[in-house]
Swiss-Prot record:
<dbReference type="InterPro" id="IPR020924">
    <property type="entry name" value="Ribosomal_eS6_arc"/>
</dbReference>
<dbReference type="GO" id="GO:1990904">
    <property type="term" value="C:ribonucleoprotein complex"/>
</dbReference>
<keyword id="KW-0689">Ribosomal protein</keyword>
<keyword id="KW-0687">Ribonucleoprotein</keyword>
<dbReference type="GO" id="GO:0003735">
    <property type="term" value="F:structural constituent of ribosome"/>
</dbReference>
<dbReference type="GO" id="GO:0005840">
    <property type="term" value="C:ribosome"/>
</dbReference>
<comment type="similarity">
    <text>Belongs to the eukaryotic ribosomal protein eS6 family.</text>
</comment>
<protein>
    <recommendedName>
        <fullName>Small ribosomal subunit protein eS6</fullName>
    </recommendedName>
</protein>
<dbReference type="Pfam" id="PF01092">
    <property type="entry name" value="Ribosomal_S6e"/>
</dbReference>
<dbReference type="GO" id="GO:0006412">
    <property type="term" value="P:translation"/>
</dbReference>
<dbReference type="InterPro" id="IPR001377">
    <property type="entry name" value="Ribosomal_eS6"/>
</dbReference>
């Protein structure tokens, strides 16, 4: 099975937490697209809803929300994900991934959209001990 590093952001506090997702937790993310809301129970966060906001593969190639599929493509881009133009009108061909989470992703970025009963700090404080 695959393993993911999930970077979970808390919009209320501005803090982020790292979750090592393996097994059922990783399976809950496979095939999902950026912007999809996922249940937090596989990550030990019952009652929470998590929205996938992005990710990157083993080479560091970022996932682009507006690119369908899960493969890597070379796109001619002028600005946005994975490229910042230094000159006016500059365009460059850069590798980008599709918006579907695949097995060769290493990191998945997400944020909390619906909060459960137990505070986030308690959930991750117990995991740190």
């Amino acid at each position: 099975m695959v393993d993911f590093k999930v970077v979970l952001s808390d919009p209320k506090t501005g803090l982020s937490y790292k979750i090592d997702a393996a097994g059922a937790a990783a399976g809950a993310l496979l095939g999902k697209k950026i912007g999809t809301e996922v249940d937090g129970a596989p990550f030990g966060m019952s009652g929470y809803k998590i929205t996938i906001t992005g990710g990157s593969d083993k080479t560091g190639t970022p996932a682009r929300p507006d690119l369908p599929g899960n493969g890597r493509r070379g796109l001619l881009i002028s600005d946005g994900f994975g490229f910042n133009a230094t000159h006016n009108g500059e365009r460059r061909r850069k590798s980008q991934r599709g918006n579907e989470i695949a097995a060769d992703f290493v990191q998945v970025n997400a944020k909390i959209t619906v909060y459960g009963e137990k505070p986030v700090t308690e959930i991750f404080a117990a995991a740190a001990e």
